[in-house]
Amino acid sequence: MAHQNNNVFDLSINLKKVEDTNKIEKIYTYNSSVVKSSDFIGKLNIVFFEAKDLDIIIGNPSYRRRFLDIHISQQDISYLKSLQRYNKVLQSRNRILKDIKARKSSKNELEYWTEKLIQDGIKISKLRKKKLEEISTETLKIFPKLSKNNEKLTIRFIPSFKNISSLNMEDLTTIFNENFDKEISNGSTFLGPHKDDFEIQINDKNSSEFSSRGQIRTATLSIKLGEANALKNSLSDTPIIVLDDILSELDFDRRKTVVNFIREYEQIFLTSPDDSLIKSIVERDDKIFNVNNGNV
């Protein structure tokens, strides 16, 4: 059962084993009705932090794009639809490029898919840039409070379309026309949101290459909390924050700093396999839930 904006609704995810396979199927329900996983997005705004989120800094660009896409989709369902359309068009366009190379299709057929790709591509990349700037603004307020040292954090968007803010349909059509032969030779689309990326730097050095594990963890947590603040500013509603085992790799001073800071948020779920860590930070109004073999 969830409460948001004075509305009450029931969200659940059930796991079901698929017969004669080792696969597990997820069944999503919203107010007792079975829905698609994408229908969950935006129903309840949550910012979730786990160890895997360090890939925002050290992982490949696809993880950073996914981070942005989930963040934006929680605020704008039309963005999610544009992204879904774009991915389908991208698949079709890449197939046509391969067919042209094999002399099974013509360049004329490619023009239709290029136009469709650009239409959604412009919206996606421009919105990613805007929303990353919002996250960055909030993150830069948080990072100095969580970092032990006087460190400088920088977040920089790297769009596939250069100068994306000033480009229009005509500009991008020209750019694609200039790259047709290379794309046909390669059998794939060179430009577009599927190539977007962003970079995090600490003290003007790429964090993925030059930062310590502690710096990366602090920067990632700052980004996730910056995301929460950006969501709150956009939706006028504070998201639920779930922090999965963030304390175990922090020293005592940094752990104390993080815990004191996150208490500013309205609703937080903090998990740890070490109950002594939880007990060391608990206060009178906090609630502790013990989970054993899936039972609370």
Question: Which role does the model predict for each range below?
Answer:
Residues 101-240, 249, 253, 257-260, ...:
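Conserved NTPase motor "head" modules and their coupling/switch loops across ABC/AAA+ ATPases, GTPases
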Residues 1-63, 69-75, 79, 140, ...:
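Nucleotide-state sensing region of NTPase/ATPase domains
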Residues 47, 269, 287-289:
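Hydrophobic/aromatic beta-strand patches that form the interior of the parallel beta-sheet core
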Residues 244-246:
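Walker B catalytic acidic pair
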Residues 51, 157, 291-293:
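Active-site donor-binding loop signature of nucleotide-sugar glycosyltransferases
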Residues 55-56, 63-108, 115, 123:
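Long, charged N-terminal accessory/stalk domains
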Residues 271-274:
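H-loop/switch region of ABC-family ATPase nucleotide-binding domains
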Residues 13, 288-291:
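A structural signal for short hydrophobic beta-strand segments in well-ordered beta-sheet cores
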